[in-house]
Amino acid sequence: MDDERGKLAVYPGTFDPLTMGHVSLIRRGRQIFDRVIVAVAMDTPKTPLFSLDERVRMAEEVFADHEGITVEPFSGLLVDYAERRGANVILRGLRAVSDFEYEFQLALMNRKLKRHVQTVFLMTDYQWLYISSTIIKAAASLGGDIKGLVPDNVYRRLREKYGYPYPLNPGLALSTEADEDLPPSL
């Protein structure tokens, strides 16, 4: 059992919505661990735009063809969930120094609750440093073109949720002049 535990990581979040920053981190986590569970949180102090089922379904669509990556909803304490799933690693992403303080506190609390569950931090790829689910929702709600910042299925769902038609008004599109090195969206 202990040999298997280090090969499985849990990457938790609300994923409301899933962004390309999340996708990048999950893929990179999969390069380190044999399996990564994308654990979609049911219990959140935030009021999600998408239901738990919608968030799980969108993530499942994104990772459908990715071996070793599964998506599951979870509720309750993250460390309890990780333990139930046989994982002793929680994978977390850091965008900036401002993320570190909060993530550090969470990691220490999780360690206090379950000493054998470790938190592993990965730095976000530089091209995703500025995005968050909150910023994505704010831009999308005002008609901003967030294409390429979220997977295509999430992009479509955001457009539907906010009632914006296709195709987008080119005047609302984000500039992509400096984004030539960004990978295409899924």
Swiss-Prot record:
Q: In which pathway does it act?
A: Cofactor biosynthesis; coenzyme A biosynthesis; CoA from (R)-pantothenate: step 4/5
Which cofactor does this sequence's record say it needs? Mg(2+)
Family statement drawn from the similarity comment of this UniProt entry: Belongs to the bacterial CoaD family.
Please describe what this protein does: Reversibly transfers an adenylyl group from ATP to 4'-phosphopantetheine, yielding dephospho-CoA (dPCoA) and pyrophosphate.
Q: Does the keyword Transferase apply?
A: yes
The record ties this protein, via Pfam families, to:
CTP_transf_like (PF01467)
Binding-site residues, substrate: T14, K46, L78, R92
Q: Does the keyword Transferase apply?
A: yes
Q: Which residues form a coiled coil?
A: none
* Site residues by UniProt (Transition state stabilizer): H22
Question: Where along the chain is ATP bound?
Answer: T14, F15, H22, G93, L94, R95, E103, W128, L129, Y130, I131, S132, S133, T134
> Its Enzyme Commission number?
2.7.7.3
Mention one GO molecular function.
ATP binding
Task: Provide this UniProt record's keywords sorted from A to Z.
Answer: ATP-binding, Coenzyme A biosynthesis, Cytoplasm, Magnesium, Nucleotide-binding, Nucleotidyltransferase, Transferase
Q: Which reaction does it catalyse?
A: (R)-4'-phosphopantetheine + ATP + H(+) = 3'-dephospho-CoA + diphosphate
Q: What is its main location?
A: cytoplasm
Query: What organism does the UniProt record list as the source?
Result: Nitratidesulfovibrio vulgaris (strain ATCC 29579 / DSM 644 / CCUG 34227 / NCIMB 8303 / VKM B-1760 / Hildenborough) (Desulfovibrio vulgaris)
Tell me the subunit arrangement: Homohexamer.
Protein's UniProt name: Phosphopantetheine adenylyltransferase
Q: Which domain of life is it from?
A: Bacteria
Q: Where in the cell is it found?
A: Cytoplasm
Q: Which SUPFAM superfamilies match?
A: Nucleotidylyl transferase
Query: What do the Gene Ontology cellular component annotations say?
Result: cytoplasm
